[in-house]
Amino acid sequence: MAKRATQACAAIFALAFLVTGVVYVLFGSCPATNADFWSIYEFYFSHSWWQTAVQKYADHSLFFPNFFWLASVKFFHGSQVPLNLIGLALLFTTAALLLLLVWRDETTGRTMKIVATMVVIVGNFWMGREAITCFGGFNSENSLTMAAAALCFVLIRGTSRLWLMILIIIGAGFVSSFSCGQGFAIWPTLLLLAWCLRFRWPAIVAIGVGTLVAIITYQLLPPLSEDYRVIQAANSGGITLVAHLCRLISSPVLYAAAAWTGIRMNEYSSVNQASTLALWTGAVGLVLAGVILIRRVVRRDLGKSSLEIAGLGLVVFNVGAVMLIIAGRIQYFHMLPSEVLAPRYLFWSSLFWTGLFLVAIQRAEHQRWGRWTAIVFALAAVIFAWPEHYLMWFHNKLSKCRVEQAATAVINGVVDDNSWFLSLDPRQIGRVAPQLRAHRLDMFADGLQDWIGLNETSLFRGRRKPEDLRGKCRVSKLVECDNGAPAARVVGLATTRHHVPRVVRWAIAPVTWIVGKEIKKGYVTPARFVIVDPTGVVRGVARSCSLTPIVNRVFYQGRFPTTDFLGYIRDYNPQVQYVVRSAADDVLSEETIPVQDDASNNPQL
C-alpha cells in the first residue's frame, strides 16, 4: 500500500511539473530578439553566414545552435517561434534521454524508478530555469548542450570496445562543446566516466585526444582569445573561487527558500542568513558529490547501474559548467557580487541537484533505512521547489509583455527607457534596428512599421466595419524619435465585442470547473491599433499584450489586465487631436478612441 501511494504521489508531482512547465514556457516565451542576439544580428549583417556561425560571442562558441538561428532568419523572417519550439523540443530530448537511463537500470525497483522519473522531470521543467527556457535562442543553445551530454551518458555504458560508439560519443562531445561555453565540461565528465567504467586505455586516450582537439579548435575560432580567463581565475584566490562555487551550486535552494518566505530574491539574498544558507548548502552538496565521486574513482565499478551513470554524469558535468561560468565571469563577480546568484545560472545548478538525487536514489535502493529516507527527501524537495515554480508562471508572462512593449517602441522608431528589456545597450538597438527593418526581420516581419506615414484610407483598401470599440487612452510620457523628433508614449484600455464560440466553451468547461472561473460572453482587446491625426495620416501604431481573457482566467487566475495597449506617436504635436482605431483582422474599426494629452501624470492602467 505504501509503495502504491508513493508511486501515485511521485507520478502526480511529475505530471504537474511537466504539464505546467510546458504550458507556461509556451505562453511565456520571449516574442522578440533580446540580449546577446542583438550582437549576433549586428555581426551577421556585415559578414557571411559561415563567419557568423564560427564566430565566438562573449567567449561562447555557438556554432551548432547558430544554424537554428540562421534558419529562422532565412525561412521564418527571424521569428522567435521556431527557436522557442526547437528549444522546447531539445528540453524534451534531454529529459527523455535521462529517463531512458532511469528505466534501463537493473539495480532499482519500479517505485524508485518512478521517484527518479519525478526528479528528472522536475529538474528539467522547473520554472525557476525560465531565464533560459523561456528565451528560444538561449534555450536552444543550452538545451542542445545538455541533450548532447545526455546522449553521451546513454551511449557510454559498455562501449569501451565499440569504436563506432566511441566516435559517436566524441562527436556528441563536440556538439556539446560548440553549442555553449559550458559544454566543454563534457570532456572531464567523459574521461571520469570512462575511468569508472573501466574503459581500455585506447578508448580513454581517444577521448583525451578529442578533448585536446576541441580545445585547440576553440582557441583558433575568431576572435582569438588573449586574456585566458581560466588562468586569471586560478590566480584570483582559492577561497573566493570556492565561495562562488558554493553559492552558484546552492542557488536553486536559495530561490526556492525565497519563494517560501514571500521575499523578493534580490532582497532575500542580501540577508546574512541567506548568505550563510547559500554557502553551507552548496558546501554540503559539493562534499556529498565529492564523496560519491572519490568512491567510484577508487572502485571503478560504475557499470552496474545506468541510473548512477546518469546521476554521476549530471553532477560532474554541471559542477564543471559552473566552474567554467566562474572562470569566465570572475572579474564581473568581484565588481557585482550579487551576479553570482543570477537566475540564468539556475539552468545548470538545478541539474546538479537532479544528478545528486539520482545517485542517492540508486544507492538507497538496497539500504535498510536509506530507501524511504531517499523517497521522503525527494518528495520534500519537489514540494519545496513548487512555490518558485508557481511564481515564475506569472513572472515570465510579465516579462513577455514588457518585451512586447519594448518591441513596439522599436517598431515605431522611438527611443524609450523600456529598451533595456531587449538589450542593456540601447545604442546597439539603434545600430541594428534599421537593418532589421530593411530586411523585415523579427518584430518588423508583420510590416506594422510600413503603416506609419500612410493615410488610413490606404490601409486594407479602406475597409472599415463596426467593432463596438470602447476604451480610453492618454499620453503618458514624452519621448523622442530615433531622428530626434518629438514623440509620445500612449497607453490605454480598449475592448471590442467578442463572443466565445459555444464549441470552445464546451471544450474548456472541465478546466473552468477546476479553476472556478466561468468563461462568459464578453470583450477582447484587439492585437493591433493605429494612431491617426485629423488628416487621417497614421502617426504611430500600438499593440496589446497577446493574452486572451480565456487564457488569463484559466492559466493565470485572472491576475493580468487583458485590455491594456501601448503605442507611440511620431512627430508628436500636443495641439493636435489624435485618435486610435483598432486594426485587427485586416480591417479598421469605424469607432475611434480619442487620445487625451496627459503627459504630466501617468495613467493608472
Predicted regions and their residues:
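Extracytoplasmic catalytic-loop and juxtamembrane helix elements of membrane-embedded
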Residues: 30-48, 135-139, 219-254, 310, ...
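Hydrophobic transmembrane alpha-helices
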Residues: 73, 95, 99-103, 149-158, ...
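Transmembrane alpha-helix segments characteristic
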Residues: 17, 116-122, 208-215, 302-331
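Intrinsically disordered, polar/acidic, low-complexity terminal segments
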Residues: 6-60, 69, 73-120, 192-194, ...
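Membrane-interface alpha helices of multi-pass inner-membrane proteins
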Residues: 164-179, 186-195
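Membrane-interface micro-motifs in multi-pass membrane enzymes
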Residues: 36, 62, 112-160, 178-183, ...
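Aromatic sugar-binding surface patches on proteins
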Residues: 548-568
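Short, aromatic- and glycine-rich surface loops/edge beta-strands on solvent-exposed regions
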Residues: 529, 573-584
